């Protein structure tokens, strides 16, 4: 065998095999600049909402797997829990938790509507009008509410950015929960799951889980961490930041409702105390990490939706919610023409350009 010096690339006349060379632009600054360029806010709203629906189906499948893997309640008893020892068991409070979540969801949509009105007021669009004026009702729903003491955020597109922040945080938390509930199966303390029903139609159960947010489907054993606590805390964070911009009372009201909801979850034995505590921490940390940004979601999250072939454009051809501005150009030549026309009894009209 012929040996070559260590510094020899190849023997004379030997052509090395072709190698796949990645495009230069993949490693260039221009490529990553394009990847970090923010998507239009409208595109983010649509695509992140689609992603949330997909994540909801993933969670529904995970709930079904967890239901089948749950330890037999007749063999494995619930784990010792300090919250269960301190709080008296009140089973019907699980229904109260759902009512509290429905109330906070309605309040959040109302706040989002008021944020949209603030955006319209900021861009000079004015208040919308109903086809028929209803005394009191029209003023309540269509008037602009603003608490200046708590308003430290740019009002333009605030409703869109708030929705993107909420829905991306919720999708991340549900996706992580889908993984966690499948990994470790714990004995359930829930009364209705002590004799868990058999799932006869898995596909129907998955669809019902998505359509009813879990209320109309069969699922047991999804303990770590609490989904009810996630949505309660998300509403709490949403109103702590954005609700306070609309009215000062939203912060204390939502805080009291959320704390009472945590109590209902533990007192009804729907979750262990650790399920609630971990969910509170993860939700607050995720909401803060996503943050409020004029470009919408962090660019790392936008990478996951940039490749979708539908649901909006990837570039901002026109500035969103832009308003036409009239600019008048004045020059000495125009002044001279105006003086000549005035002296001749003619009128000279200064042209304006819309940019």
From Swiss-Prot:
Membrane topology term reads: Multi-pass membrane protein
Q: Where is the major localization of this protein?
A: membrane
Any idea which UniProt keywords this protein has? Kinase, Lipid metabolism, Membrane, Sphingolipid metabolism, Transferase, Transmembrane, Transmembrane helix
Membrane-spanning ranges: 45-65, 90-110, 166-186, 206-226, 252-272, 276-296
Biological process (GO) annotations held by this record are:
ceramide biosynthetic process; sphingomyelin biosynthetic process
Which ranges form a coiled coil?
Answer: none
- Its encoding gene is what? SLS1
Q: Which residues lie on this side of the membrane: Cytoplasmic?
A: 1-44, 111-165, 227-251, 297-355
Protein name stated in the entry? Phosphatidylinositol:ceramide inositolphosphotransferase
One Pfam family linked to the record: PAP2_C
Q: What is the source species?
A: Trypanosoma brucei brucei (strain 927/4 GUTat10.1)
> Which InterPro entries does this chain map to?
Sphingomyelin_synth-like (IPR045221), Sphingomyelin_synth-like_dom (IPR025749)
Function statement: Bidirectional lipid inositolphosphotransferase capable of converting phosphatidylinositol (PI) and ceramide to inositol-phosphorylceramide (IPC) and diacylglycerol (DAG) and vice versa. Direction is dependent on the relative concentrations of DAG and ceramide as phosphoinositol acceptors. Does not function strictly as a SM synthase. Essential for viability of the pathogenic bloodstream stage of this human protozoan parasite and, consequently, can be considered as potential drug target.
């Amino acid at each position: 065998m012929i040996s070559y010096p260590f510094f020899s690339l190849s023997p004379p006349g030997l052509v090395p095999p072709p190698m796949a060379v990645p495009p230069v632009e993949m490693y260039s600054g221009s490529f990553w600049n394009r990847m970090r360029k923010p998507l239009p806010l409208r595109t983010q709203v649509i695509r992140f909402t689609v992603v949330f629906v997909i994540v909801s189906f993933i969670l529904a499948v995970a709930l079904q797997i967890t239901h089948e893997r749950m330890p037999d309640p007749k063999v494995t008893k619930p784990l010792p829990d300090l919250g269960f020892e301190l709080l008296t068991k009140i089973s019907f409070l699980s229904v109260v938790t759902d009512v509290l979540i429905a109330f906070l969801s309605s309040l959040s949509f109302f706040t989002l509507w008021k944020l949209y009105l603030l955006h319209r007021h900021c861009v000079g669009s004015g208040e919308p009008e109903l086809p028929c004026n209803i005394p009191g009702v029209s003023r309540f729903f269509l008037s602009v509410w603003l608490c200046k003491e708590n308003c430290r955020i740019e009002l333009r597109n605030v409703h869109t950015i708030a929705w993107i922040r909420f829905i991306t945080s919720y999708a991340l938390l549900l996706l992580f929960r889908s993984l966690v509930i499948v990994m470790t199966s714990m004995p359930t303390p829930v009364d209705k799951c002590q004799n868990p029903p058999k799932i006869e139609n898995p596909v129907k159960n998955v669809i019902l889980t998505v359509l009813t947010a879990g209320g109309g489907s069969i699922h047991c054993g999804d303990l770590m961490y609490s989904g009810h606590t996630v949505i309660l805390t998300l509403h709490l964070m949403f109103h702590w930041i954005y609700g306070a911009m609309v009215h000062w009372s939203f912060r204390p009201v939502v805080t009291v409702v959320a704390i009472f909801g945590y109590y209902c979850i533990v007192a009804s034995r729907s979750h262990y105390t650790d399920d609630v505590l971990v969910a509170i921490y993860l939700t607050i940390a995720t909401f803060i990490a996503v943050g409020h940004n004029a470009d919408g979601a962090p660019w790392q999250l936008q990478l996951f939706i940039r490749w979708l072939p539908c649901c909006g454009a990837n570039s901002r051809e026109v500035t969103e919610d832009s308003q036409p501005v009239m600019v008048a150009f004045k020059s000495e030549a125009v002044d001279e023409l105006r003086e000549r026309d005035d002296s001749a009894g003619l009128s000279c009209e200064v042209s304006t350009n819309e940019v």
